[in-house]
């Protein structure tokens, strides 16, 4: 069975019934030649003891899909790439809110990349495929969803599902997902576009999403499985019992500027409520308390028009920004907003340390990297340390995307750049604090960024047509609210967006209002950062490596490298520098000592310079013959000093060795270069 859904001038093609027929639902989704097999399967029984939806979404990249063999000794795929993890998160986020409440069956969604055509990204294809697989399966699901990427032509027109090449030229890369009624997820990177451009893109996307969702819904009604009967559990009897006596007290307990004090108040209430209860009643009482907390929270915001920390809805928390907080590190920034604190550190290196990518995408290197760390102590807890979790990878990628548009080009700043953001305290919006801390670190390190970038997380509490939009949400507002909408940008425009919904979606009009409120908050934060450091420092840190860039003729590349790398290795050893050469003749020379770098550059210029008549060299005699001596002017380039020119005046020299021997150093002038590129020399007296 086949379904073709138009997307702009092209179409996404869905097929089912041929591959993976034992999966709960299986769809092959194709756009261009990029093809993803999406499957959705559930367990036969609910997971024992589950208190949340046990949904897992994974992306399996197969290097054969791009005609490649994996690198490394094993020559097979290993752990998921960063792109696979980010695509799994992108697929997970819009579908997770659409499962029934208290649905505890294990649900596994897998997207296997079968073809990566190097032209069309596979992430949106995976999202649409996953939606269709769930719709066809017997799994209860409040979708289907649609998904589309929107780019922008240089002339301002929008492009639906742009190619990699079109994205290179686009100032907007926004992925939007949602149901036929509303938007449920947004993920975007941009080059300082205005809020109006983003809203226009959302409106364009919403129309495409509606068409996709309706088409998949009709297709599933015709070809899908009958949905698993599932009745949501009835009302917890303890909710009504506790509401009258405790709702106001819970609401009072939520009001505090101190996260720990709020937790302690709720913990005391828990102890009081479970005291004297039977073993069977305790989990029901705790569940009732959790429900009443959410109810109290919503009453506080929608009826009392108050926040738990008593800020105005558009007010940011007390904020401080500090630059240069650590010695020797190439650049540092400490950003504190309320009970969220992030320390960002900059490391600069020569371009030999750019990240090499072995992925399904055309991009093969990454020069600017941002890594985010979230240790357990940041929330006052214990926990495991180890490889980064998906959340850390996702938050790091978002902060990286927010800053990428202002990072100077390789020609302007020939360094590999790595930022690490260490979350020291967390009570909401740590990824946006990472953006702010990273901006401080970059400017402190003398990286000539185009403009400072700040970020703020927006929230929403909504019941029917009544809603409040929140600026700079803290952890409780993220947990109990309906939206987490992160917005980063400069004074001139947006550089990154990420939105996740816990309700079934919001309109583009509401998001427009949230974007404007976010813009005002972002400008306040940028003002605070500007008071600490207004622009990048004029020089990089004394402890950072020095990099100089020179251009040599392409026909001199072999001369610089030498046989088996002999010449370039000798230069690196002699001057204590790293030298890398590009195919176009660009040479990067990096070292800790500036004088050593300059000396190495001088040597490279000398050896790769075109020899011209009249040039004077100090060279070593490399060979003597009965008619003269050969003098090395530059590595691999010799000239002949004829025996007749070994002595001053017309004095005759009978044997070359009477004047010069191999290994002697002599000062010579270039007399001429003949048509066969042979060089004639004469002695120069000191």
Curated annotation (Swiss-Prot):
Top-level EC class as recorded in UniProt: transferase
CC per GO annotation: cytosol
Enzyme Commission number(s): 2.7.7.8
Catalytic activity, reaction form: RNA(n+1) + phosphate = RNA(n) + a ribonucleoside 5'-diphosphate
Biological process according to GO: mRNA catabolic process
Residues of the KH domain: 545-604
PROSITE patterns: KH_TYPE_1, S1
Gene3D superfamilies associated with the record: GHMP Kinase, N-terminal domain (3.30.230.70), K Homology domain, type 1 (3.30.1370.10), Nucleic acid-binding proteins (2.40.50.140)
Annotated Pfam families: KH_1 (PF00013), RNase_PH (PF01138), RNase_PH_C (PF03725), S1 (PF00575)
Keywords: Cytoplasm, Magnesium, Metal-binding, Nucleotidyltransferase, RNA-binding, Transferase
Entry cofactors: Mg(2+)
Every S1 motif domain range: 614-684
Cellular compartments annotated: Cytoplasm
Major localization class: cytoplasm
InterPro entries with a match to the protein in the record: ExoRNase_PH_dom1, ExoRNase_PH_dom2, ExoRNase_PH_dom2_sf, KH_dom, KH_dom_type_1, KH_dom_type_1_sf, NA-bd_OB-fold, PNPase
Binding site for Mg(2+): 478, 484
One Gene Ontology term of the molecular function aspect: magnesium ion binding
Function: Involved in mRNA degradation. Catalyzes the phosphorolysis of single-stranded polyribonucleotides processively in the 3'- to 5'-direction.
Family, as annotated: Belongs to the polyribonucleotide nucleotidyltransferase family.
PANTHER family: POLYRIBONUCLEOTIDE NUCLEOTIDYLTRANSFERASE, POLYRIBONUCLEOTIDE NUCLEOTIDYLTRANSFERASE 1, MITOCHONDRIAL
Database matches in NCBIfam families: polynuc_phos, PRK11824.1
Protein name (record): Polyribonucleotide nucleotidyltransferase
Provenance organism: Rubrobacter xylanophilus (strain DSM 9941 / JCM 11954 / NBRC 16129 / PRD-1)
